[in-house]
Swiss-Prot record:
It comes from Caenorhabditis elegans. Pfam families: Sugar_tr. Its main location: membrane. PANTHER family: SOLUTE CARRIER FAMILY 22 MEMBER. Transports organic cations such as tetraethylammonium (TEA). Displays a broad substrate specificity. Keywords: Glycoprotein, Ion transport, Membrane, Transmembrane, Transmembrane helix, Transport. This is Organic cation transporter 1. The gene is oct-1. It is a multi-pass membrane protein. The chain crosses the membrane at residues 41-61, 156-176, 185-205, 213-233, 244-264, 270-290, 361-381, 390-410, 417-437, 447-467, 477-497, 505-525. The keyword Kinase does not apply. Residues 1-40, 177-184, 234-243, 291-360, 411-416, 468-476, 526-585 are cytoplasmic. GO terms for molecular function: organic cation transmembrane transporter activity.
Amino acid sequence: MSFQAMETFAEISQEILMSATKPPDFDFVLEQVGNYGTYQIVFFFIICLPTSLPSAFSAFNIPFVVGNPPHTCHIPEGKEYLRPLTNDTQILSCKQYNETQINVFRAFTSAPVDTYSDRISLVPCQNGWDYDNSTYLDSLVTEFNLVCDQQAWIEISTTSFYVGSFIGNCLFGYVADKFGRRRSFFVILTVLIVCGTASSFAKDIESFIILRFFTGLAFPALFQIPFIICMEFMGNSGRIFSGLMTSLFFGAAMALLGVVAMFIRRWRQLTFFCNAPFAFYIIYYFFLPESPRWSVSVGKWADAKKQLKKIAKMNGKSNVDVDELVDSMKNHQNAAEEKETKRSHNVTDLFKTPNLRRKTLIVTYIWVMNAIIYNGLTLNVSNLPVDDYWSFIINGAVELPGYFVVWPLLQCAGRRWTLAATMIVCGIGCVSAMFMPDGYPWLVASASFIGKFGVGSGFAVIYIFAGELYPTVVRAIGMGMSSMVAGSGLLLAPHIVNLGKIVKILPLLIMGLMALSAGILTFFLPETLGAPLPMTIEDAENFGKKPEPDSGMFTQAAKKRESQPLLEPHTPMDRRRRSSRLMNI
C-alpha cells in the first residue's frame, strides 16, 4: 500500500469514527427534506405573513383612538364674555372667566368685560368643551372628555397596554416553549380578538383601560410566535427572508392602518374594524402545524416525523428516509441533551452560564434601545407640518426601503455587521439634526426619517439575530424576555419626546446617542451567519466563546458559507463514497 493510500485510508477511518459519534442534528435533517422549498414558501405567505396584520392594527390604532383635537371651553349662547381675552391656547382649552365675579361687576357697571378682566379669576370649564372635528369625528378623548385635569387618563390607557405587553412577553414566552408554538398562538389570538373587539363597546374609560391591558398582553407574542415558527421551519437563507418579509409586511400594515384610519374617523368603528375581522384567522387552527424543531427539543419524536414527512413530500423529496434520519438523531442524543429536553426551562436558564448571560444582556440592551427609538421617532413625527394621518402613513412607509437594503447585507456581511450598521446610521441621522440650520424644518424632518430608516431596519435584524442566538429550548422565553424588558423601556419614549418642549432638538439627540451605543455594543456578539441554530443551553453557551482569528466582515461571512460540508459523514451517500474510495486503494 502506497503512502498516499495509507493517508487516504487514515482519513476515511477518521470519517467513519466521526460518523459513529456525530449524529445528524435538526438542521441537517431539515436540509434533507428541504429547508427552503415549496412548503416553506407556501407556509410563510399563506399563514405566517398575514398574522402581522392583527398585531399592527390592534396595537397601533391607539393614536387615532385617543386623538386629542383642539378644544375650547363650551360657552353658552349669549355669554361670550366668559371666554378669556387671550391668545394662549393652553388657557383657552381649559379655562373660562368666573361667571359669579363678572355678574358682581355687571351689577355695578355696564363697562365691557375687557376693562376689568384683569381682576376676574379663571376657573375650569363649567359647561364642557367644544372640539374641533376637522381631524377626528370623535375619539375616546371627545366622548369621555379626557382633557385638562382628566388628560392623565390618556396616558394611563396607553401605559396599560405596555404593562400588559410587559407581562405577556414573559408569560406567553414560557407558554410557547412549554406547551408548543401552535397552541400558544391560538390562545393569544383569541385573547386579542375578544378583548380588542370588546374595547370598542367600552361604556367608560376604566373598562377601556382594562380591555386595553389584555390586548397588550397578547400583542407581542402574536407577532413573535408565527415568526419563531417560520424561523424554525427554514434554513439560513429562509430565516433571512422570513424575518425581513415579516418586518416589511408589518411596516406596510402600519402605513395601511393610517389609510384605514383616514376613512374611519370614529374611534369605536375603527377599534372594531382593527380587531373583529381577524376572527377569520381562527380557521388557521386546522392548518397551522407545530414546529418540528420544538417537537424535537421536547422529545416528541413522532410529531416531528409526521411534520417532516409533510415537508419532504411537498418539497419533492419523498425519497428521503425521514424515519431513519429522525431515529438516528434520537438514538444519538447524549446524556446532557436528554436532560435538557426533559427538564422544564425558564428565564433563569439564560443567565446561569457566562457566555449565554453576556449575549442575553447585550441582545436585551440593543432591543430596549431599538424599541425606545422606534416608538420615540414615531411619536416625534407627529410634530411635522402635516396632519396626523399623513404623519402616520409616512412613519410606516419610510421603513420599507430599509428592508430591501438589509436583505443582501444579511447574506454577505452577516447579522452582526448589518445590525451595527443600521443602528449607527440611525444614530448619525438623529444626531445630525442638531447641526441643521434654523429655518429649514424639512432638514430636521429628513434627519428624523433617516433615523427611522435605520432603526426600522434594525428592528427586523434584531429579531433574526436574537432568534439565532437563543437556543430552541428557551428561544421563545428569551425573545419574550428581551421584548418584555424593551416593552418596559417604551414607557420612556413619550417622556423623551416631551423634552422637546425644553429644547426641540433634544429628543433626537438623546435617541441618536442611544442608537450609537447599541450599534457599538453589537460588535461584542458572535456572528451567526451560516451557523446552525443552537438546540440546547450547552449549544448556546459554547457558541461564540472563542472569537475567530479573522473577523473581517465579508471574509468571515464567506468562510462560514464555505465551511458548510457538502455531504455529512453520516449520510448513506457518503458511506457509498467511502466504499468506492476504499476499493480504489
